[in-house]
């Protein structure tokens, strides 16, 4: 074992021990639950003023998931019908993106270490999701989230080389050896290419102008890449723009980046198998031009555990989570 890996191991043990013991405050905001959506891990906010929300009970991987709509004006939750799917379609949604009129959904198989993954493309029309395409590629090995460049192009994160590999997870957590990557895919050409690798559990993506932002959950960093103007399969000028422990989903809205985080990975892992074990959550607003990072939410886990996605609309926060069956809606200040 190299000296740098030994030093990283000792540092990691100290950091994770401190974070496990650290206490987090309960959110002071007035919040209430939007119930009835199992594991609302990711969402997109449409210009029509509604959310499309992924739903899957991740404590029961055999179960299938759904997509729900949520209207903040009426406070109404509605399951979205899906049509044109083949029989026994493995609809277990993860990260999503929306490029009108299409919803792009990462899907997985029914085990934690599944090798079956796809990107399903649905047309969202008359409040129905119509499956148009189901894209698979050998370089999509452990997908977490995606962001579209055009109707047929997207970037997608592979958080590991082998999904749910405890060996890779241990080496990333305690030795600083990273296995994650970002791939560029062109569905029209049936083409994918790895455009960045050796990332520590790359999670989510956002595009602002020609800049690609990526959160790395186990590196605790937000990176910015420049997208080559002539070839989107080339990323240049990798730069760290923020340090956020356990960063999860990124949403770009109203000229700001909104990012949730899991400051204690150990408590997150406990919560993944036991809903009674709280997993604290933090969230931030980042200016993509100046990189100014402002905390906007903190909770010990009493109001919401393992918060995975957040957006600020006026003076309200809307928050999703990985496991428990509700969104959280909070009024700030």
Map each language-model feature to its residues:
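A short helix->beta-strand "capping" segment at the edge of beta-propeller domains
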Residues: 22-38, 294, 298
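Beta-propeller blade signature
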Residues: 65-72, 117-124, 175-186, 278-288
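Short loop/turn segments that connect beta-strands within beta-propeller blades
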Residues: 71-75, 124-127, 186-189, 227-230, ...
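Loop/turn-rich, solvent-exposed surfaces of beta-rich toroidal or solenoidal domains
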Residues: 244-288, 292-294
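Asp-box/WD-like beta-propeller blade repeats and closely related beta-sheet repeat scaffolds
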Residues: 90-92, 106-149
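Blade-loop segments of beta-propeller domains
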Residues: 66-99, 107-109
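Beta-rich, blade/repeat-based domains predominating
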Residues: 37-47, 63, 85-100, 137-154, ...
């Amino acid at each position: 074992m190299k000296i740098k890996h030994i030093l990283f191991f000792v540092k990691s043990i100290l950091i994770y021990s401190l974070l496990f013991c650290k206490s987090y405050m309960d959110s002071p905001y007035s919040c209430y639950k939007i119930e009835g959506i199992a594991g609302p891990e990711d969402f997109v906010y449409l210009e029509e003023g509604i959310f499309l929300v992924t739903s899957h009970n991740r404590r029961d991987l055999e179960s299938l998931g759904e997509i729900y709509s949520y209207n903040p004006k009426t406070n109404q939750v509605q399951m979205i019908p899906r049509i044109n799917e083949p029989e026994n379609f493995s609809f277990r949604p993860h990260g999503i993106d929306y490029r009108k009129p299409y919803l792009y959904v990462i899907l997985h198989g029914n085990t934690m270490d599944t090798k079956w993954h796809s990107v399903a493309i649905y047309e969202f029309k008359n409040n129905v999701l119509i499956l148009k395409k189901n894209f698979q590629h050998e370089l999509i090995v452990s997908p977490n989230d995606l962001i579209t460049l055009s109707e047929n192009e997207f970037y997608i994160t592979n958080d590991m080389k082998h999904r749910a590999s405890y060996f890779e997870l241990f080496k990333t957590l305690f030795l600083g050896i990273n296995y994650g990557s970002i791939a560029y895919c062109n569905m029209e050409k049936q083409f994918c290419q790895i455009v960045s690798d050796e990332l520590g559990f790359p999670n989510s993506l956002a595009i602002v102008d020609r800049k690609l932002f990526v959160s790395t959950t186990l590196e605790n960093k937000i990176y910015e890449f420049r997208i080559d103007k002539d070839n989107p399969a080339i990323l240049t000028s990798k730069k760290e723009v923020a340090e956020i422990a356990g960063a999860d989903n990124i949403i770009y809205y109203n000229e700001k980046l909104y990012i949730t985080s899991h400051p204690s990975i150990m408590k997150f892992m406990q919560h993944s198998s036991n809903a009674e074990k709280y997993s604290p959550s933090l969230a931030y607003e980042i200016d993509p031009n100046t990189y100014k990072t402002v905390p906007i939410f903190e909770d010990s886990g009493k109001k919401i555990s393992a918060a995975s996605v957040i957006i600020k609309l006026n003076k309200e926060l809307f928050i999703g989570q990985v496991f428990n069956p509700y969104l959280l809606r909070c009024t700030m200040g």
